[in-house]
Amino acid sequence: MFKPQTQPRKTALITGACSGIGYEFTCLFASYNYNLVLVDINENKLIEIAERFTQEYNICVTSIAKDLSISTSPEAIYLELQQASIHIDVLVNNAGFGIYGLFNETNLNSELDMIQVNLVCITHLTKLFLKHMVEKGEGKILNVSSTAAFQPGPLMSVYFATKSYILSFSEAIANELEDTGVSVTVLCPGPTQSAFHQRTGTENSQRMKDMKMMDAKTVAAIGFRGLMKGKTVVIPGAKNRILAEAVRFLPRKQVTKISKAVQGH
């Protein structure tokens, strides 16, 4: 059990803060007495959450409405916080989305936006906020990946590739940052109850109907515990952990075929 922090309060920045796992992280950090910087594309929802959480938890909440598919957004977020003298102690790179379909038929611009949000933005924000953490000698970064990171994903090829990048990137910099006081955790949830599947168009797939998915609150709680303990890789659910390890021992071609069968409608 983690005790709510005492003064001075630390500040957590959470991207994709208005829904799903991101919203549950917002609730968790607020309940542990963190001031919040919430980033999301949904400005109206941001304002509503900021006002409600300020009153409920008596914390400072800064809302920043940004489209993270725009390449200048990470720098704009960083500069806005610098100007406001808000220093980030915990960075939660949660924002992301997926696209379903055959690669030769999916929309290129949508996939480039996805690469920007899922991959480039995480790299950019981490680069911007990490330096101060290292100079201070403390800080935490949580990057949200997926069990998709552990194998190729036909029918969601670009999405799976971005999640593999997040896993590899996070593990590498976690190693680089040993003995600095800064930890990096990568959260790799399996399919989770959220609006993600509606956006990808997979909510009515047989896979989704047959699968017992974790709820976002449980996933966030497991990720939060792992982050606070300084774990590098966190995979919620025993079944997900077993599957993530099992693919290492199978031929890659076979793993890819199985992945395609699972993804298929």
What spans do the regions from the language model cover?
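Conserved NAD(P)H cofactor-binding loop of Rossmann-fold oxidoreductase domains
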Residues: 94-99
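C-terminal helical subdomain
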Residues: 186, 207-243
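Conserved glycine-rich Rossmann-like NAD(P)H-binding loop of the short-chain dehydrogenase/reductase
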Residues: 32-49
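Substrate-binding pocket helix/loop in short-chain dehydrogenase/reductase
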Residues: 102-104, 110-115
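Active-site helix of classical SDR
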Residues: 126, 162
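Residue(s) in the substrate-gating loop at a strand-loop-helix junction
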Residues: 146
